[in-house]
Each structure stands twice: as structure tokens, then as C-alpha cells.
UniProtKB/Swiss-Prot annotation:
PANTHER family registered for this protein in UniProt: KETOL-ACID REDUCTOISOMERASE, MITOCHONDRIAL
Residue ranges of every copy of the KARI C-terminal knotted domain listed in the record: 182-327
Catalyzed reactions per annotation: (2R)-2,3-dihydroxy-3-methylbutanoate + NADP(+) = (2S)-2-acetolactate + NADPH + H(+); (2R,3R)-2,3-dihydroxy-3-methylpentanoate + NADP(+) = (S)-2-ethyl-2-hydroxy-3-oxobutanoate + NADPH + H(+)
Positions bound to Mg(2+) 2: 190, 226, 230
Coiled-coil residues: none
InterPro entries xrefs: 6-PGluconate_DH-like_C_sf, KARI, KARI_C, KARI_N, KARI_prok, NAD(P)-bd_dom_sf
Name under which the protein is recorded: Ketol-acid reductoisomerase (NADP(+))
Binding, substrate: 251
UniProtKB keywords: Amino-acid biosynthesis, Branched-chain amino acid biosynthesis, Magnesium, Metal-binding, NADP, Oxidoreductase
Function: Involved in the biosynthesis of branched-chain amino acids (BCAA). Catalyzes an alkyl-migration followed by a ketol-acid reduction of (S)-2-acetolactate (S2AL) to yield (R)-2,3-dihydroxy-isovalerate. In the isomerase reaction, S2AL is rearranged via a Mg-dependent methyl migration to produce 3-hydroxy-3-methyl-2-ketobutyrate (HMKB). In the reductase reaction, this 2-ketoacid undergoes a metal-dependent reduction by NADPH to yield (R)-2,3-dihydroxy-isovalerate.
Any one biological process term the GO annotation gives: isoleucine biosynthetic process
Residues where NADP(+) binds: 25-28, 48, 52, 82-85, 133
Residue ranges of domain KARI N-terminal Rossmann in the record: 2-181
Length: 341
């Protein structure tokens, strides 16, 4: 079982007198920066000019170019999108890294797949909250926290792990629990979860169910409710208490259908394909394809994205959500050219 660390296992002294540069001020960036500051850590922000720069200044931070922030910092936390990190790192961060500095990530993709090769004279570790930035911030303010993973890739100072734990504590994660992992494990399991279950698997399952009902002559609106809209009700139960709590909370008819029909949908053939997906991740095949896609300016990505946004389930969903202000108020609709939004 994984080793779990809490507040009492972390020592803030490893951040005392240090300057932390948060590179990026998006979902995770703003949460890390504000939580660290509220924990007494000296934080600066590294950005390129734009709206995020203005927002960070409005939030009371000193904002610099990425290169200048990296030069001023003892700890550099890179919170940019994976595909943007290598170029920014090479051009603006790497030249300013000094012996004994710490280079930190919230996802191991670029280190694990050698898109970023750090110098030998810096600590390299990972602090990955298991929740979106707004939740990391909100729970911190409420006196709680979001669990996180930590991993050490390179320990030059002899206390990279201690610094990682101190950082995790300062963003509130050690209030909930910090699990130790490796860059390899975090990267491969995160990608697998996204592809096979949370994103790829789930969206494919929802669409297949929706299409099955529509092709059988049922109204698309009813199919949408049954296969997509009600998903939140089930996911909330799973989130609160796992599979057993969800099954306890639904009707016996639904539970019997779960037991008898679920394995017909997710069968051994599906599991075998999951193993193939995992193999593609482990061997670097997926990473290579994604890197090449970005280098080519994402032609396939953009084409698929456009096609998916025009699927009937999205057309119907936009219409139905317009009838539900309690949903619409919380959502950000994807703007699809030619579609009603």
C-alpha cells in the first residue's frame, strides 16, 4: 500500500527564506500561488504578457517574465500545459537554473518522456494535487485540502523529498493526505485513467449508449437524459462512497442490471484493449504520437474535435441545457461554428 503523509510529516523550514516562482497562472497556477502565499511562502509569478499577467497583478503578486522569475527563484514550479512546457523550459527556464534550485512539476509527462532533460545540479520533484485548481483553492480556504501525489526524480540537495512535502503542506494537500509515487507511475497511470476510463472510455460509452437508443427509434432528448445527464447523479455517489455506496443508493432493479449487464458491455475484449492502451503509454507510443501531432499544429486533433462538437448528443445537449438554468449558470459552452450556443 502507498505511504501517506500528513501535516505532521512535513516541515515548513524547507521553504523558509525561499522564493517560489509559479510559471503559469491558470487553473492550478492561481491556486498554488495563493495557497503558498497564505502559508507564508514568498511567491512570484512568471508569465508572458496577457490577461493572466493582469489577473496575477490584480491578485497582488509580483509578475515577471518567465526568464526573470526563474532567475529570481529558488524553486520553479512549472504549471503550463504539457505541450508548451518544453519550449518555454529550454528558452526561458533552463538558462536561469542555479545549483541547488528545485525544478517542480504537477505532472510527469515531459520528464518521463524526456521532453525536458533537467541539468544535474538541481532537485527535480513533482507535487500533483488530485483535483482542479478551483477545488485546491476553495478547500484550502475552508481549512481542508485536496490530496496530492509527490515524487522525486532527482535529489541533489539531499532533501528534495522534504521540500516536496513542505510544498504539498503549503498548498493544503497534507491536510488531506499526500501519497508518494514515482514520475513513471504518476505519468502512466494518469494517462491511462484519462484515456481508458475518465475521458476516452466514458465519452465513448456515453455516445455508444445514446446512439443505440436513437438508432432504435427513441427520442434523442430522452436518450440524452438517460445516457449523459443522469451520469452526474451516479458519479457523485461513486465520489462520495465508492461502488458499494452507489449500489446501495440506487434501486434494486438498477443494481441487478448493473450486476448482469455491466460485464456484457465492459467484457474481456474491452479489458484486453485497455491493456493495449496501457502498453502504448508504457512504450511511449502515445507520447510520440501526441508530440508529433503538436509539432504539425494539431490537424487531426482539430478535425476530430470539430466533428465531436457537432455530434447529435452535443446539439441535443445544448438545447436541453438551455432549459435548465441551474446547469447553464455553472457551465462554459464550447462555441461551435454554425451551431446555436
Amino acid at each position: 500500500m502507498a505511504k501517506v503523509y500528513y501535516n505532521g510529516d512535513a516541515n515548513e523550514q524547507y521553504l523558509q527564506g525561499k522564493t517560489v516562482a509559479i510559471i503559469g497562472y491558470g487553473s492550478q497556477g492561481h491556486a498554488h500561488a495563493q495557497n503558498l502565499r497564505d502559508s507564508g511562502v514568498h511567491v512570484i509569478i512568471g508569465l508572458r504578457k496577457g490577461r493572466s499577467w493582469e489577473q496575477a497583478e490584480q491578485d497582488g503578486f509580483d509578475v515577471y517574465s518567465v526568464r526573470e522569475a526563474s532567475k529570481k527563484a529558488d524553486i520553479v514550479m512549472v504549471l503550463l500545459p504539457d505541450e508548451k512546457q518544453p519550449a518555454v523550459y529550454k528558452e526561458e527556464i533552463e538558462p536561469e537554473l542555479k545549483p541547488g534550485n528545485a525544478l517542480v512539476f504537477a505532472h510527469g509527462f515531459n520528464i518521463h518522456f524526456s521532453q525536458i532533460v533537467p541539468p544535474e545540479h538541481v532537485d527535480v520533484f513533482l507535487v500533483a494535487p488530485k483535483g482542479p485548481g478551483h477545488l485546491v483553492r476553495r478547500t484550502y480556504v475552508e481549512g481542508a485540502g485536496v490530496p496530492a501525489l509527490i515524487a522525486v526524480y532527482q535529489d541533489v540537495t539531499g532533501h528534495a523529498k522534504e521540500t516536496a512535502l513542505a510544498y504539498a503542506k503549503a498548498i493544503g494537500a497534507a491536510r488531506a493526505g499526500v501519497l508518494e509515487t514515482t514520475f513513471k507511475e504518476e505519468t502512466e497511470t494518469d494517462l491511462f485513467g484519462e484515456q481508458a476510463v475518465l475521458c476516452g472510455g466514458l465519452t465513448a460509452l456515453i455516445k455508444a449508449g445514446f446512439e443505440t437508443l436513437v438508432e432504435a427509434g427513441y427520442q434523442p432528448e430522452v436518450a440524452y437524459f438517460e445516457c449523459l445527464h443522469e451520469m452526474k447523479l451516479i458519479v457523485d455517489l461513486l465520489y462520495e462512497g465508492g461502488l458499494s455506496w452507489m449500489r446501495y443508493s440506487i434501486s434494486d432493479t438498477a443494481q441487478w442490471g448493473d450486476f448482469t449487464s455491466g460485464p456484457r458491455v465492459i467484457n474481456e475484449a474491452v479489458k484486453a484493449e485497455m491493456k493495449n492502451i496501457l502498453h502504448d503509454i508504457q512504450t511511449g507510443k502515445f507520447a510520440k504520437g501526441w508530440i508529433l501531432e503538436n509539432q504539425a499544429n494539431r490537424p487531426e486533433f482539430n478535425a476530430i474535435n470539430q466533428r465531436e462538437n457537432e455530434h447529435l448528443i452535443e446539439v441535443v445537449g445544448r438545447e436541453l441545457r438551455s432549459m435548465m438554468p441551474f446547469v447553464k449558470a455553472k457551465q462554459k459552452e464550447v462555441v461551435v461554428p454554425g451551431a446555436k450556443n
